[in-house]
Amino acid sequence: MNIIEVENVSFKYGNSKAYSLRDVNLNVKKGEFLGIIGPSGSGKSTFCLTLNGLIPHSINGEFEGNVFVDGLNTREHSVAELSTRVGLVFQNPDSQLFNMTVLEEVAFALENLGVEREEMWRRIRWALKLVKLWDKREEFPPNLSGGEKQRLAIASVLVMKPKVLVLDEPTSQLDPLGREEVLSLVRLLNKEEKITIILVEHNTDFLLEHADRIVVFDGGRVVMEGKPEEVFENVEFLERIGIRIPTRVKIGYELKKRGITRRAVLSYEEIIAEIAKQLR
């Protein structure tokens, strides 16, 4: 069952002559973990903004096509209504945090929606425990680490109980520890909470291991999609458009070029076995 359906979507920002998205068609299944990759300026972030209605409702430009989220056409429903179905997390957590305590940050959206107090507290406790920030609920958000800030931004979206979580390069400004904290949380949300994940991420090693499907953007278009092992087999094409190749695929590709293997996408066990054969 598709939870998101994108039909012939194109978009051009109001002050631009060029389209940021061109004829994008894409379906996302309920419960799927979808990874999105592409060079800078390829339309990835713009695509994310179409999924919760910020485009076309809040961002000026020319929008063509339709996006359906959980059966709702984003043209016909407000961003507030869509936010209970799609949560959006940006690169910089500071752009989403503006309250005095962690607790107030997570409560903010629920108060605006008029959620009953008992239900509000139940959701807040659930979300903060899930992202491992319950013990820091009285902290001033700017005092948190980068990884903690991003987890707080995720919690502030999770309390809305969205069926889909869209994360636009959530680890790009984090140190290695912060990246691991956030990506571990993303895995948990998909596997245990059954939330559909759409993750724009430069960490292709992570996507190769954990995504169900990869979509490649270039020039505002979807130029490739498939299972991770299928997509990353196209090493030369991905390198040509500026995609970082996962470590084990790089090794496998070198073996393939030397005629040692037929595939570039190999497990580390397969790589070790092939190298061992050559050393005998």
Curated annotation (Swiss-Prot):
Residues annotated to bind ATP: 38-45
Assigned keywords, A-Z: ATP-binding, Cell membrane, Membrane, Nucleotide-binding, Translocase, Transport
Disulfide-bonded cysteines: none
Transmembrane segments annotated in the record for this chain: none
Gene Ontology MF terms in the entry: ATP binding; ATP hydrolysis activity; ATPase-coupled transmembrane transporter activity
Topology versus the membrane: Peripheral membrane protein
Name of the top EC class for this enzyme: translocase
InterPro entries the UniProt entry points to: AAA+_ATPase, ABC_transporter-like_ATP-bd, ABC_transporter-like_CS, ABC_transpr_CbiO/EcfA_su, ECF_ABC_transporter_ATP-bd, P-loop_NTPase
Protein's recorded name: Putative ABC transporter ATP-binding protein PYRAB03730
Keyword Membrane: yes
Protein family (similarity comment): Belongs to the ABC transporter superfamily.
Pfam families: ABC_tran (PF00005)
GO cellular component labels: ATP-binding cassette (ABC) transporter complex
Function: Probably part of an ABC transporter complex. Responsible for energy coupling to the transport system.
Domain ABC transporter: 4-244
Lineage: Archaea, Methanobacteriati, Methanobacteriota, Thermococci, Thermococcales
Cell location: Cell membrane
Catalytic activity, EC: 7.-.-.-
